[in-house]
Each structure stands twice: as structure tokens, then as C-alpha cells.
């Protein structure tokens, strides 16, 4: 269900609260540049609280060069210098951009998968305005989102591993901190 909010911070915080209550990760679409940074505090809090979320905003990749697209003059000044994904990278789990309209669906699916993997957290996708305006038809077979992998061993796995190590002639265990 689409809910329009008048403020980006409110939208991000509503998505966080809804996810806490229902356990269902949410998607938030915010305005490019200023809207993204307006929601930054909420996005950072979601990252610290390990709340899975997909945050998206758009910018222009043609900067008004295509006369058929309604690109406003603000894009010429670089609403998001270096790309919006660079703005949010320090406070999201992963930040990327959608390369083309046909890849939008799979990019969103992949981002949703990543958001729900441990440690959970918000994922950012920069979806260029040109891709949002392009006509798109879903493929005949859309890939379903697989469940996030288990973050702890299932019953019996630890015992089976211990037995394998005990039975090994020269076991080697490599660990990292």
C-alpha cells in the first residue's frame, strides 16, 4: 500500500516502526538530494537498529540533455554531487544505483534480499528519473524473493561439525575476529 508523507524523516520513521511491529521490511521513496539527506537521521537510526529497509530516490543521468524528458534546471547544478549513493553510503548497509529501466525489478529484489540478511539494515538504490519515466512491462517469470538465510545453526549441525572435526586426521580451524 502506498502512503504519501509530507516529510522524508516521517516516511523513514514510519517504515521503521511498521517493520518493528510487523516484521515486514518496507520501501521508502524520497526526493533526490535534499529529501534523501532530510531522511538521513532516520536512515542512520534504522542502520543502528538493524531494521531492513529499501530507501530509493532519483536523480537525472541525462541532466536535461534529452529534450523529450521533463528535466528541470535544478539537475544542471548537480542536486547530488557525485551521485546520491555517495551521499548515503556512510550510513546504509549498501548503496548502489539502477543501471537501466529493465533491470529495476531485479535491482529492487536484490536490494530487498540484502536488507534482510544479517546484519539487517537499510539499503539505498539510486533510481534515475529517466528510468522512472520509462515504460516497463514485467517479464513473464518474475523471480520471487527467497527467505533470508538462517543466522544460527540448525539443530544437530554443531554436533555434526564437532564429530567431523574429531574424526579428522589433521583438522585445521581458521577463525577471524
Please state what every model-predicted region is.
Residues 1-177:
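N-terminal alpha/beta PP-like core and its mobile active-site loop of ThDP/TPP-dependent enzymes
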